[in-house]
Amino acid sequence: MPTNSIVTIRYGPYDSCGIVDHRTFRLDGLQAVLKGDGHRYVLEKTDDWNTVELIVNGERVYTCNITDLVFGGDGRLDPLCQEAIDAVREAY
């Protein structure tokens, strides 16, 4: 996939301390990895609980549980962020 492509990050609400809400703290690493690889991204809220989906050219290329992502990390040590960036690179 060429750099400077737009990746849509769809994320749903998740439960934290008994409160269900859309939060982006767990997406920090994913955003950093995408930006570091030269991609632009758009955050899009969805009603599906606990989900993260990466959409490239209208096609879902990666999905995972948002609570499995490392909280507030830079994405370098998070294996899910590495899987996600590999999926974006392989998208056409």
From Swiss-Prot:
Regions that span the bilayer: none
Domain of life: Eukaryota
A Pfam match: UPF0728
Matching InterPro entries: UPF0728
Family note: Belongs to the UPF0728 family.
UniProt-recorded name of the protein: UPF0728 protein C10orf53 homolog
Organism whose genome encodes this protein: Danio rerio (Zebrafish)
